[in-house]
């Protein structure tokens, strides 16, 4: 197990190295105007632009720039912002936004895990009955409808009938976080419910479940002490992936609800 874990970690490091190098090289292929704001492009002369590029080390040989890039990376020096907040450390710029996205993402992940597993348990317990049909319809709806449409429905229902704020506000964080967290949770709840139902239904067909029923164990004991425990084993592998997707998939949601998180920052960094 240890050997396998170390092997996978090394493979991950190699993958990260290759991706980082590819991104670095692609950034260096961009026109030099990209490194200046619109205001700087209008004011700077060609000599001033050249001097600024030299000061940033962007005129050095590409291998020298790459070595410096990884050296700075190892020292957690991500440089300074040139387009978002000119001259501000990148770590500081990200730090202001990262906390907001992380809080919403982790809260949504926790809620979706609890509600999704609970829904999957009920669907498996009442297989081919009304609750199972409702859960299946919800899963199909969430996966079939574009995110923008489902977000709009949440916005209308939540603001008109429940009175929640339509935009994120730092003055009223708790109330204004409800609708963004709900939107982030929709897909994850459906995913957890689908996985839980699938594995629990598979477990219910095992011979040991039939033996447990013959021994007189109640349906509740069978469901929670045996079926759920065994069904969670293969499902655990999906939890980290789901959390990463929930936390990282907030670009549209943050733009939709004007959340000052990583989403708008990532978007503006490419514009």
Mark where each language-model region is.
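Alpha-helical transmembrane segments of integral membrane proteins
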Residues: 2-3, 98-131, 147, 171-271
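Generic alpha-helical transmembrane segments of integral inner-membrane proteins
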Residues: 9, 13-26, 106, 110-118, ...
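Residue-level recognition of pore/gate-forming positions within transmembrane alpha-helices
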Residues: 12, 43, 113, 140, ...
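Residue-level signal for discrete positions within transmembrane alpha-helices
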Residues: 12, 97, 101, 137-144
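Hydrophobic alpha-helical transmembrane segments of membrane transport/permease proteins
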Residues: 16-67, 161-173
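Membrane-water interface segments at the C-terminal ends of transmembrane alpha-helices
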Residues: 23-30, 71, 137-165, 185
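Short hydrophobic, aromatic-rich alpha-helical segments embedded in or entering the lipid bilayer
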Residues: 45-76, 177, 257-270
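An internal, D/E-rich "acidic patch" concept
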Residues: 58-117
């Amino acid at each position: 197990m240890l050997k396998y874990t170390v092997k996978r970690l090394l493979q991950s490091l190699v993958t990260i190295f290759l991706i980082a190098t590819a991104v670095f090289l692609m950034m260096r292929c961009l026109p030099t105007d990209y490194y200046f704001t619109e205001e700087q492009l209008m004011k700077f002369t060609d000599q001033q632009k050249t001097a600024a590029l030299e000061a940033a080390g962007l005129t050095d040989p590409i291998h020298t720039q790459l070595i410096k890039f990884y050296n700075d990376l190892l020292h957690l020096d991500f440089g300074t912002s040139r387009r978002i907040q000119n001259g501000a450390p990148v770590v500081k710029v990200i730090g202001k936004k990262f906390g907001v996205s992380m809080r919403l993402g982790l809260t949504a992940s926790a809620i979706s895990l609890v509600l999704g597993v609970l829904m999957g348990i009920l669907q498996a317990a009442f297989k081919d009955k009304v609750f199972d049909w409702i859960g299946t319809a919800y899963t199909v709806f969430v996966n079939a409808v574009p995110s923008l449409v489902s977000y709009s429905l949440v916005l209308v229902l939540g603001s008109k009938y429940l009175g929640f704020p339509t935009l994120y506000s730092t003055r009223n964080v708790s109330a204004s976080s409800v609708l963004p967290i709900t939107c982030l949770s929709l897909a994850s709840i459906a995913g957890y419910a689908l996985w839980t139902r699938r594995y629990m239904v598979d477990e219910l067909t095992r011979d040991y479940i039939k033996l447990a029923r013959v021994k007189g164990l109640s349906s509740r004991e069978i469901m929670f002490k045996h079926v759920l425990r065994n069904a969670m084993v293969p499902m655990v592998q999906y939890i980290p992936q789901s959390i990463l997707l929930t936390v990282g998939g907030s670009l549209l949601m943050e733009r939709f609800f004007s959340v000052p998180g990583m989403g708008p920052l990532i978007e503006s960094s490419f514009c």
